């Protein structure tokens, strides 16, 4: 499982 955040 992988999570990515970009903002």
Swiss-Prot record:
It comes from the Eukaryota. The lineage of its organism: Eukaryota, Metazoa, Chordata, Craniata, Vertebrata. It comes from Rattus norvegicus. This is Unknown protein from spot P11 of 2D-PAGE of heart tissue. On the 2D-gel the determined pI of this unknown protein is: 8.5, its MW is: 42 kDa.
């Amino acid at each position: 499982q992988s999570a990515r955040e970009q903002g």
